[in-house]
UniProtKB/Swiss-Prot annotation:
<dbReference type="InterPro" id="IPR027417">
    <property type="entry name" value="P-loop_NTPase"/>
</dbReference>
<comment type="similarity">
    <text>Belongs to the ABC transporter superfamily. Heme (hemin) importer (TC 3.A.1.14.5) family.</text>
</comment>
<keyword id="KW-0547">Nucleotide-binding</keyword>
<protein>
    <recommendedName>
        <fullName>Hemin import ATP-binding protein HmuV</fullName>
        <ecNumber>7.6.2.-</ecNumber>
    </recommendedName>
</protein>
<dbReference type="GO" id="GO:0005524">
    <property type="term" value="F:ATP binding"/>
</dbReference>
<feature type="domain" description="ABC transporter">
    <location>
        <begin position="5"/>
        <end position="241"/>
    </location>
</feature>
<comment type="function">
    <text>Part of the ABC transporter complex HmuTUV involved in hemin import. Responsible for energy coupling to the transport system.</text>
</comment>
<keyword id="KW-0997">Cell inner membrane</keyword>
<keyword id="KW-0472">Membrane</keyword>
<comment type="subunit">
    <text>The complex is composed of two ATP-binding proteins (HmuV), two transmembrane proteins (HmuU) and a solute-binding protein (HmuT).</text>
</comment>
<feature type="binding site">
    <location>
        <begin position="37"/>
        <end position="44"/>
    </location>
    <ligand>
        <name>ATP</name>
    </ligand>
</feature>
<keyword id="KW-1003">Cell membrane</keyword>
<dbReference type="InterPro" id="IPR003439">
    <property type="entry name" value="ABC_transporter-like_ATP-bd"/>
</dbReference>
<dbReference type="Pfam" id="PF00005">
    <property type="entry name" value="ABC_tran"/>
</dbReference>
<dbReference type="GO" id="GO:0016887">
    <property type="term" value="F:ATP hydrolysis activity"/>
</dbReference>
<dbReference type="InterPro" id="IPR003593">
    <property type="entry name" value="AAA+_ATPase"/>
</dbReference>
<keyword id="KW-1278">Translocase</keyword>
Length: 268
């Protein structure tokens, strides 16, 4: 993905509402980018535009200098994989069958990819389980394995691709949130471009190279975590009181300010 992913004045509007408003951004190969913002900020709409799932109503989104709208569906599927916010399967497919849906190569060549993806998400011992019997978090991990296989099978011919994750940790416990973030970071270090919508600002600060803050369909901030996570910005965008601190390695982290703490500080 030598040319990177680029949005130029990209907007998406419905009658009476603009969900994403003239967004300009460039994301280079191997970056791990977190998109954060309050509910209704336009994060999922922007991610779908960056994936090619939604065509901008104005402006353009391009991959390697070519508009996403100009890619044939199969060619685009070989270049990018997206984990949707919610994926429901009503039929009793096994976990391995779900993962296999991501492959577009000879099944004999795909088998090692299945094994690696299932190990990465911690479901190798569940490969023969009916996916409808799994918990919501386990199902989310199975679908993450599926898109990893899609990504890896496409990269075999097309080179490093694009991995898009829409709130991938929403159903996961702490351990598996960290496991998923580590897997995403390994993908980025191998050259894959990773874009993830996250609500956990500390997870974003710990794993992302760059944080984009979206508010009202527009980019409110874009940069390294330490530059973006500022008290004033968080208060303005999220309408909440948080304290921004820095750990011994210089990484920012945020903690909530409780009402009692604010009252005590005011009278100190």
């Amino acid at each position: 993905m030598s040319g990177g992913l680029k949005a130029e004045a990209a907007s998406f509007a419905l009658p009476g509402a603009t969900l994403v408003d003239r967004v300009d951004l460039t994301i280079t190969q191997g970056e791990l980018v977190a998109i954060v913002g309050p509910n209704g900020a336009g994060k999922s709409t922007l991610l779908r535009m960056l994936s090619g799932d939604l065509r901008p109503t104005s402006g353009t989104v391009s991959l390697d200098g070519r508009a996403l709208a100009d890619y044939p569906p199969r060619a685009l599927a070989a270049r990018r994989a997206m984990l949707a916010q919610h994926t429901t399967v009503s039929f009793p497919f096994s976990v391995e069958e779900i993962v296999a849906m991501g492959a577009d190569i000879d099944p004999r060549k795909a088998a090692p990819l299945f094994d690696a993806a299932l190990r990465d998400v911690g479901l190798d011992h569940f490969r023969h389980r009916d996916i409808t019997t799994l918990s919501g978090g386990e199902q989310q991990r199975a679908h993450f394995a599926r898109i990893l296989v899609q990504l890896w099978s496409g990269e075999a011919d097309a080179g490093p691709g694009l991995l898009l994750l829409d709130e991938p940790t929403s159903s996961l416990d702490i351990r598996h949130q960290l496991d998923l973030a580590e897997t995403a970071r390994r993908c980025a270090r191998r050259g894959t471009t990773v874009i993830a919508i996250l609500h956990d600002l500390n997870l974003a600060a710990r794993f992302a190279d760059r944080i984009i803050v979206l508010s009202g369909g527009r980019i409110a901030a874009d940069g390294a975590p330490a530059a973006v996570l500022r008290h004033e910005l968080i208060a303005d965008v999220f309408d909440v009181a948080l304290t921004v601190n820095t750990d011994v390695a210089g990484q920012p982290f945020v903690l909530p300010e409780l009402a009692d703490d604010r009252r005590a500080a005011a009278h100190a």
